[in-house]
Amino acid sequence: LAAAVAAISFASPAQAVTDIMWWHAMSGELGRQLEKLAADFNASQSEYRIVPGYKGNYTETVTAAIFAFRSRSQPAIVQVNEIATGTMMAARGAIYPVFELMRDQAEAFSPAAYLPAVTGYYADVAGNMLSFPFNASTPILYYNKNMFRSAGLDPEISPKTWPEVGAAAKRLRASGAVCGFTTSWPSWINVENFSAFHNLPISTKANGFDGLDAVLTFNKPAVVRHIAQLVEWQATKMFDYSGRATSAEPRFQNGECAIFIGSSATRADIRANSKFEVGYGMLPYWPDVQGAPQNTIIGGATLWVLRDRPRDEYKGVAKFFSFLSKPEIQAAWHQNTGYLPVTRAAFDLTREQGFYDRNPGAAISIEQVTLKPPTENSKGVRLGSFVLIRGVIEEELEQAFSGKKSAQAALDSAVERGNRLLRQFERANPDR
């Protein structure tokens, strides 16, 4: 018996598996696809086990990770949405930059493999990647081809400019549509991506990339005119405000609104749940704005690595990121979820596999984010407390859409309130 116990004791260390916690914000089908990634990695080797844990929406997930870090019970990996990048960067002592992790663990990792829109958003000034790109999306236009036919519009041609959207919406309303068009994510689409696609700044300091002393500047004529036009169109339901986040999507799927501008990541869901033929197009632009169209910016999230976990876990995290970087893994994630292929190799593989030929509209998002090389106005937004600032912008947009404020007054107020939040963040992070 003693010999048997000794044999078991001797064998145990070789059989030990290191568990690695991964906190995330994906539920439903996306959550199942995420869990499949973890399961596939776990099955590919025997040393490490990725343990996914759903913690609610992005805000709830980040908040849970912050509180866990304070009690020293944090996960090794946490999924963080793009607008919290500036806040995460300020937490220097808590994060383990991905470029350092991969270098320390001798795992190959090249920012050049990723799309410029991705590296620009998540890299430091030296081009070093701070977090691991995971789920990326950008806004595109969806339209109901059946309703286009009823309105006498060509169902094979999507509106490319805002004047064309307005003209189409007018005809759609005249033909019986409840609303001509609507959008999800009001600030992300109508302020942040609107500005990027027209090569206009959100703020000074290269949208915050060059320092915490950035000042918001989006209350300028082009953005004001755009919001004012939406307000005017709303009077006749050519445009109809449908709320924040994804609340507009069902109005397109149920046939109320003929045109919908939303995340490219909803493409698969829209195609599966809409009882009509769906058309796709790029985000519209105003043709009289010099430099438009430029490129859109991404939304979604990346994976951040937190410090103060056992050393063995970091080796496993690095191997997991190498696994996720494989073209076939990236391509499958892109095809199964609707998120962008964040590497050029994954895009090329997906194209070679004929996916874009079989799925019209699936390539529009990557064509749009790579339309032109990113400028300092179109590589992203890196402002502290931007989660809160986006909320302020949407509050003020609602004031405009409800007729309580003019577009100019609403955007002026959003800039003033947002700048107060920026100064608070700057004071709270004096050493950054």
What are these regions (language model features)?
Residues D40-Y114, S150-G152, I157, R251, ...:
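Extracytoplasmic "Venus flytrap"/periplasmic binding protein-like
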Residues S44, G127, A151, A228, ...:
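Extracytoplasmic/periplasmic substrate-recognition and gating elements
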Residues F67, P75-A76, E107-M147, Q290-T296, ...:
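A structural signal for short loop-to-beta-strand junctions that line the ligand-binding cleft
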Residues I83-I140, G166, E192-A196, A222, ...:
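Hinge/lid segment of periplasmic solute-binding proteins
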Residues F99-Y114, S158, L200-R225, A272-N273, ...:
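Short, solvent-exposed loop/beta-turn-alpha elements that line the ligand-binding surface or hinge
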Residues A113, G281, Q335-E395, Q399, ...:
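Long, aromatic- and glycine/proline-rich binding clefts that accommodate carbohydrate-like moieties
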Residues A123-F134, P139, P163-V215, C257:
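Extracytoplasmic/periplasmic solute-binding protein
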Residues G166-R171, F209-S242:
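Glycine-centered hinge/linker elements that transmit conformational signals in sensory
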